Amino acid sequence: YSNLFQTLYYVADRKYGGRLPIPVHCIMDEWPNVALPDDFDKILATMRSRGISCSIIIQNIAQMKALFKDSYESLIGNCDEFLYLGGNEKEGHKYVSELLGKETLDTNTYGQTKGRSGSYSVNYQQTGRELLTPDEIRLLDNRKAILFIRGERPIMDDKYDLKKHVNFRYTEDG
C-alpha cells in the first residue's frame, strides 16, 4: 500500500493540482494482515481531498487496536461510515453498543389507595437505556448489519444475499 499511496498522492499533487480527475476507491480486505504505511493515520485523514477513498475491512476492533495501540480510535474517527456485520468479540460488542447510544423511556406509574379518603397518584419518569446492550449486540441476527454514517442515526438493515446477485454465477462460489 505504501507505493500505491505515494504514487496516487504524487500524481494528484504534481499532475492534477492536488486532486485526481477520476476518484480512486481502495478496498482493503484483510487490512490488519498486510504491510501498511507507517503514517497510515495521516494518509487516511488527507486522502479525501485528493479524490482517494478506501474501505478498511477488519475482523474485529482488537486487530486494529493491536496494530495502532494509541491511534486506532483516530483511524475509526476518520472513517465516515462504519459497518458492523456481527462478531464474537466482547470489546467490539461494547464499542458498537456505545456508538448506538441511548434511548429515553417514558414510564408511567399509577397508584391508588382505598380507604376513607382514597387517593390516586400518577408518576411520570424518564429513564435512559442503551439502544442495544453489548449482550444484545452479541446476539444480533446473522442476517442483520448495523451501519453508522457520520451525521446520521444508525441503521439496522438486512445484509445483502450475494447469491441473489445476477453475476453470482460467475464467481468461484457460484
Sequence positions of predicted segments:
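Conserved P-loop NTPase motor cores
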Residues: Y1-V122, R153-E172
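P-loop NTPase catalytic cores that bind/hydrolyze ATP
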Residues: D135-K163
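Acidic, polar loop-rich interaction surfaces within structured domains
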Residues: T104-L105, G128, L139
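Charged, amphipathic alpha-helical segments
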Residues: V122-P134
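Small/polar glycine-rich anion-binding or flexible loop at a beta-alpha turn
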Residues: T113-R116, E130, L140-D141
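N-terminal nucleic-acid engagement/recognition segments and initiation subdomains in replication
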Residues: I137, E172-G174
